[in-house]
């Protein structure tokens, strides 16, 4: 399976490097390159910000509100992500994404626009959170050694799940690469291999593990873990519906034989 993932990564890199069409010129070329750079830069910074700030229990964030203002500001930051994220994945949200950007390529750039917005949402959440400075002591000393390892493993699983799902979609590259290649975006086949052969939603499951295995537990992190953890559990219900519409009977068959987020079938068979 490692060879398959390596091939996917190399194919993804090749796709970005060889997708240029001579027919794409002028402002369209500039838009494609600008969206691509913006997308991957904000995505990378957002991921680093998530890993770093949750590692320290949100105590290194740069928000400076206190008291009631901190509660209101932090509440807005934590709620905006699941609400806007879910809306943009809905039918109405997709229509809005189709209008965000230059008129002639906005629809093709929709997946890239979505990734840029999601990355900015995460950046705002993790960079501008106002720390409460309420830190909880670990009940057992050994947790201080185990949790960082589990946290690291969770992020590795998330990276693997992202590769298995298809880097072109998950990274937002599908949109700008399609514009650069002068073709309509073509979504990859339904992922069924790797972690997707065990559960239907390994990305959500991996991120759930990340938010509950943070090495530093604070009042702030508790709130973040509760809200984002709940989102990871319930958001895949809506994703099941979207995938059912996109893939039809193929997804129904896959859904009937593959567990939601816990590999119960695999556990029973071992």
Outline where the language-model segments fall.
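Hydrophobic transmembrane alpha-helices
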Residues: 42-52, 64, 68, 76-78, ...
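Membrane-interface helix termini and inter-helical loops of multi-pass transporters
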Residues: 55-65, 96-100, 129-141
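Transmembrane alpha-helix/helix-exit interface in multi-pass inner-membrane proteins
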Residues: 152-174
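Alpha-helical transmembrane segments
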Residues: 66-80, 143-160
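Hydrophobic alpha-helical transmembrane segments of multi-pass integral membrane proteins
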Residues: 39-50, 75-83, 112-126, 151-155
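Membrane-helix interface/capping segments
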Residues: 84-103
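Short, Lys/Arg-rich, polar N-terminal cytosolic tail immediately upstream
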Residues: 1-28
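Juxtamembrane inter-helical linkers in multi-pass membrane proteins
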Residues: 173-186
